[in-house]
From Swiss-Prot:
SUPFAM superfamilies (UniProt xref): Prokaryotic lipoproteins and lipoprotein localization factors
Protein name (record): Outer-membrane lipoprotein LolB
Superkingdom classification of source: Bacteria
Subunit structure: Monomer.
Main location: membrane
Its biological purpose: Plays a critical role in the incorporation of lipoproteins in the outer membrane after they are released by the LolA protein.
Similarity field: Belongs to the LolB family.
Any matching Pfam family: LolB
GO biological process, alphabetically ordered: lipoprotein localization to outer membrane; protein transport
Subcellular compartments: Cell outer membrane
Membrane topology summary: Lipid-anchor
Length: 205
């Protein structure tokens, strides 16, 4: 395991156990789905919190996460079960920046590479901007469930093929109307698996 992770996560060996949920029957794209896509693309400023479970051949971890997105910036904070910050990532037009627990600052143009080099975690941050909303932007293939929201998608990102399974949605109010947003999804790439369970969505104007 990466030395930085060992220092940051003393004694953290438990994996977040998250039960799977069956996907609803698939249904072809229709006008309702196209309208839903347009609505999702209008959401530019939001926050969410939840749990992230990470499984790879060389490590298994569980984190609390906070995700904030605005038109100018994306931020991701991972913390352990004691509330100690493991990763504090900021991404803007200047690139990606990570500030560590001991006030060291690291930069890279690619957020995924920066996280991987510092922690050994392979998290497709920039693709998650759309995936976490339920948007299949430039996906190689995607399928819908019977509610006309995403059931699965597959996308080649940075030479890696990621498969995303949307296991559960919740209704969140947006512009005085409820819209379905993901609250449980699983990302898979080769032998790496990431489980996200979202406990709170906050959509901002």
């Amino acid at each position: 395991m990466n030395a930085l992770v060992r220092r940051l996560l003393p004694g953290l060996a438990s994996l977040l156990l998250l039960a799977g949920c069956a996907t609803a029957p698939l249904q072809p794209v229709n006008v309702q789905w196209q309208s839903h896509q347009v609505t999702l693309e209008q959401i530019q400023h939001y926050q969410l919190t939840g749990k992230l479970g990470y499984i790879a051949p060389d490590q298994r971890q569980s984190f609390n996460f906070q995700w904030q997105k605005s038109p100018q910036k994306l931020s991701l904070r991972l913390s352990n079960f004691l509330g100690q910050t493991v990763l504090n990532l900021q991404v803007d037009e200047q690139g990606a920046r990570v500030e560590t627990y001991d006030d060291q600052i690291y930069r890279d143009q690619d957020a995924q590479s920066l996280i991987r080099n510092l922690t050994g975690l392979d998290i497709p941050v920039e693709q998650l901007e759309d995936w976490i909303l339920g948007l299949p932007t430039q996906a190689t293939h995607y399928e819908l469930n019977e509610q006309n929201t995403l059931a699965t998608l597959t996308k080649l990102a940075s030479t890696e093929e990621w498969h995303v399974e949307y296991q559960r949605y919740q209704a969140i109010e947006w512009q005085h109307q409820p819209i379905p947003l993901p609250d449980k999804l699983k990302l898979q790439q080769n032998k790496t698996s990431i489980q996200l369970v979202i406990s709170q969505w906050t959509l901002l104007p």
